[in-house]
Amino acid sequence: MILGIGTDLANIERIQGVLDRFGDRFRNRVFTDVEQAKSERRLDVAGTYAKRWAAKEACSKALGTGLRMGIAWKDMSVSNLSTGQPVMHVTGWAKARLDELTPPGHEAVIHVTLTDDHPWAQAVVMIEARPILPDVQTAQTT
């Protein structure tokens, strides 16, 4: 079952302006060390940050709160699998909200997709509640 869907569009040039003006103050307030390391290694630094900004906004919308109720920027973090697929991680208040949304007997799965076409970066986040299936091996032995 779908618990929430969020989307966001970020202007890469605006993010570049914020990076130019506020530098590390902005980076350290919004992005985790992992996100910063990934972004700074990329050819399009601002575009990479913009996609992660959009992902955090989209995730907060999928959680049904936006950036309110104690949820902070760093409570949501994007990393990538070895295949390049983005993965959303939640901690702190965002994790608490996710746990609150997830029905008993289910596990939450966060799906995220990122794209950009200069000057825009976009993210879509969908939160799914997946039923936890009983352990088949345990069921066979009882």
Curated annotation (Swiss-Prot):
It comes from the Bacteria. GO terms for biological process: fatty acid biosynthetic process. GO terms for molecular function: holo-[acyl-carrier-protein] synthase activity; magnesium ion binding. It catalyses: apo-[ACP] + CoA = holo-[ACP] + adenosine 3',5'-bisphosphate + H(+). SUPFAM superfamilies: 4'-phosphopantetheinyl transferase (SSF56214). The keyword Metal-binding applies. Mg(2+) binds at residues 8, 57. It is found in: Cytoplasm. Its cofactor is Mg(2+). Gene3D superfamilies: 4'-phosphopantetheinyl transferase domain. Belongs to the P-Pant transferase superfamily. AcpS family. Transfers the 4'-phosphopantetheine moiety from coenzyme A to a Ser of acyl-carrier-protein. This is Holo-[acyl-carrier-protein] synthase.
